[in-house]
From Swiss-Prot:
<feature type="transmembrane region" description="Helical">
    <location>
        <begin position="49"/>
        <end position="69"/>
    </location>
</feature>
<protein>
    <recommendedName>
        <fullName>Receptor expression-enhancing protein 6</fullName>
    </recommendedName>
</protein>
<feature type="transmembrane region" description="Helical">
    <location>
        <begin position="115"/>
        <end position="135"/>
    </location>
</feature>
<dbReference type="GO" id="GO:0005789">
    <property type="term" value="C:endoplasmic reticulum membrane"/>
</dbReference>
<keyword id="KW-0472">Membrane</keyword>
<keyword id="KW-1133">Transmembrane helix</keyword>
<dbReference type="Pfam" id="PF03134">
    <property type="entry name" value="TB2_DP1_HVA22"/>
</dbReference>
<dbReference type="GO" id="GO:0030665">
    <property type="term" value="C:clathrin-coated vesicle membrane"/>
</dbReference>
<dbReference type="InterPro" id="IPR004345">
    <property type="entry name" value="TB2_DP1_HVA22"/>
</dbReference>
<feature type="transmembrane region" description="Helical">
    <location>
        <begin position="93"/>
        <end position="113"/>
    </location>
</feature>
<comment type="function">
    <text>Required correct function and survival of retinal photoreceptors. Required for retinal development. In rod photoreceptors, facilitates stability and/or trafficking of guanylate cyclases and is required to maintain endoplasmic reticulum and mitochondrial homeostasis. May play a role in clathrin-coated intracellular vesicle trafficking of proteins from the endoplasmic reticulum to the retinal rod plasma membrane.</text>
</comment>
<keyword id="KW-0217">Developmental protein</keyword>
<comment type="similarity">
    <text>Belongs to the DP1 family.</text>
</comment>
<keyword id="KW-0968">Cytoplasmic vesicle</keyword>
<feature type="region of interest" description="Disordered">
    <location>
        <begin position="187"/>
        <end position="208"/>
    </location>
</feature>
<feature type="compositionally biased region" description="Polar residues">
    <location>
        <begin position="197"/>
        <end position="208"/>
    </location>
</feature>
<keyword id="KW-0256">Endoplasmic reticulum</keyword>
Length: 208
């Protein structure tokens, strides 16, 4: 447990030494206040934890933690020449996707669970932790991968059938739309019958 906190601390220190929008803001605050950006970051983390405990904006904070940080490092992984970090973050997004779907269907019950957002935040931090046994790796190796390999053929067949049906439906809709447009253009608007104009001749009254 101590090793994971040490690695997280090293990752945070490396992040604070990089040049990005977060460190630029921290550097400006450090220049004005004289407080080191390391302590500013730790203070922000403490305030975030307090909001999670109190429940104010906890859902938004959890989503930002689970998305913004991994998205940033996923972009860096895409731009890097190596592929090891690509696999790491792809694994995280697979677990994040499954977790989000499960949370959607059980949110009405989990909303009343005490300190749910604190537990969710800790779970997401565990999934993105910079260690080989983080949550995404453990869950993928022991849950997702065995299930996928066991049902891969069935899943591929189902996806193929859905794709074929979707393409067929799209072709039918396109064909019907084109047929309707061609028919309307061929028939054209119906011609209205000519209306007779009133006679301009004035009839003189007859005198008996």
């Amino acid at each position: 447990m101590f090793a994971i906190f040490t690695k997280i601390k090293d990752r945070v220190e490396a992040f604070l030494n990089e040049k990005n929008i977060v460190t630029d803001c921290l550097n400006k605050i450090e220049e004005k206040t004289g407080i080191k950006k390391r302590y500013l970051a730790y203070g922000a983390a403490g305030v975030t934890g307090a909001f999670l405990l109190l429940g104010y904006g906890a859902s938004l904070i959890c989503n930002l933690i689970g998305f913004v940080y991994p998205a940033y490092f996923s972009i860096k992984a895409i731009e890097s020449p190596g592929k090891e970090d690509d696999t790491q973050w792809l694994t995280y997004w697979v677990i994040y996707g499954f977790f989000s779907v499960g949370e959607f269907f059980s949110d009405i019950f989990l909303h009343w669970f005490p300190f749910y957002y604190v537990c969710k935040c800790l779970f997401l931090l565990w999934c993105m932790a910079p260690v080989s046994w983080n949550g995404s790796q453990v869950l993928y190796r022991h849950v997702v991968r065995p299930f996928f390999l066991k049902h891969e053929a069935a899943v591929d067949g189902m996806v193929s059938n859905i794709s074929v049906k979707a393409m067929s439906a799209a072709e039918n809709v396109t064909r019907e739309v084109l047929h309707t447009l061609v028919r309307n253009r061929t028939v054209g608007p119906a011609e209205s019958e000519p209306r007779s104009l009133p006679s301009s001749a004035h009839t003189e009254p007859t005198v008996d």
